[in-house]
Amino acid sequence: MMARSATRRLERPCDERAGAGRPATTRHWVPIVVGVVAWLAVWQIVAMAVGQEIVVASPLRVAQVLGHLVASGSFWVTAARTAGHIVAGFLLAVALGTALAWVASLHRWVAALLSPPIRLTRLVPVVSFIILLLIWGGSAWLATTVSCLMVLPAVFDSISEGLARVPSELREMARVFRVPRWRTLTAITAPALWPYLIAACRVGVGLAWKAGVSAEVIGLPAGTIGERLSMAKLYLATGDLFAWTAVIVALGIATERLALWLLGRAERRFEGVGL
C-alpha cells in the first residue's frame, strides 16, 4: 500500500506539486518577516530615542560589529567550541533521559528511585549547579555538564509520559504473538513516542543553550562565547553583547532545526515498519 501511494505521488505533475506548495510557503514566511522587520524598527527607534550606544546599541551598529566578528578567524573557532559543548550536553541528555525513562517504565522501584533526583534537578537553580561543578571539576566541560543536567528532566518527563500512553492492547498483542522486542520497539513504541520526543527536543534545545552559555559566562572557559559575553560586560561594549547574543539565537535555531529534521527522517524510516 505504501508503495502504491508513493507511486501515485510520483505520477503527479511536478508543476502541480510546486504550485501547490508555493502559496503555503509564502503564507508561512510573510508574517515572520513582517514581524522581524517591525521589531527591528522598534529597536532602532528606541536606540535613537535613548541616544547612548552604551545603553542600547542600534541594529545597524550590531550588524557592523557582527560583520567584523564573522570576518575574524577566531569567531568560527569560538562559535564551534561553544556549540560543540552545548550540543554534546543536549545529545547526552536526550540519550540518558530516554534510557532512564524506558527503564523506569519497566520497573516501579527504578521510577521511585529516580523521582527525587529528577525533581531536585528540575528545581535547583542552574547557578547552584554551575558553582558546584566549578568547585568539583573546573570549567573544561562545564557547559556540557550543565546543559545535560538542565535538559535531562524535560526529556525524562516527556518520554515517561509517552511510554505511559503507548496502547496497552498493542503491547499485549505483541507479547501474546511473541513478537521480538526490537520489532515491538520499532513498530509500536517508537511511533507513539515521536510527538513526545519532538516536544522534548523543542524545549530542550532552548534550555541547553541558556544553561550552557550561562555556565560559560560564570566559569569563563577560554575561547568560548560565554567568555566573549563576559568581556563585553567588562568593557561595556553593548554592541558586542548584542552581536554575540544574536549569534547564540542563530545557533540555537539552527540546532533546533537540525534536531527536528533528523527526527523527521527517523520517523519516516519507522513509518514503513510493521509487525
Model segments located where?
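Generic hydrophobic transmembrane alpha-helix motif, especially the helices
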Residues: 119-154, 161-162
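C-terminal transmembrane helix and the adjacent membrane-cytosol boundary/short C-terminal tail
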Residues: 108, 164, 195, 199, ...
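Transmembrane-helix boundary motif in ABC transporter permease subunits
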Residues: 88-118
